[in-house]
Amino acid sequence: MTHRKLEQHEIEQALNQLNTEASEGWAIEDEKLSKTFKFKDFQHAFGFMTMCALYAEKQDHHPEWFNVYNKVSIQLTSHDVSGISNKDFDLAKKMETFALSV
């Protein structure tokens, strides 16, 4: 699959699928795939961020994120294509898996 910016209808379809397969909460905000995760405490939030960081580094695809205590707010976009790509949805799915494991 070619890495490219997704068209609006492709984004909507992938977003619907993501929110069906994963927990609800993913949305498009400021042309980025966004969600805020809430964890039991800071330790669990940081554990989640660590798993995501290690995976993202291997994929060479890094999230924009912000952490306060037990909350992690995430925005995903593909800077190299100036928009949302399949890489963002793939990373979002992996983040859902990591969130369930902490």
Swiss-Prot record:
Catalytic activity: (4aS,6R)-4a-hydroxy-L-erythro-5,6,7,8-tetrahydrobiopterin = (6R)-L-erythro-6,7-dihydrobiopterin + H2O
Record-stated family: Belongs to the pterin-4-alpha-carbinolamine dehydratase family.
A GO BP annotation: tetrahydrobiopterin biosynthetic process
Protein name: Putative pterin-4-alpha-carbinolamine dehydratase
UniProt KW keywords: Lyase
Key word Lyase present: yes
InterPro entries: PCD_sf, Pterin_deHydtase
Any GO molecular function: 4-alpha-hydroxytetrahydrobiopterin dehydratase activity
Membrane spanning stretches: none
Domain of life: Bacteria
UniProt-listed Enzyme Commission number(s): 4.2.1.96
Pfam families: Pterin_4a
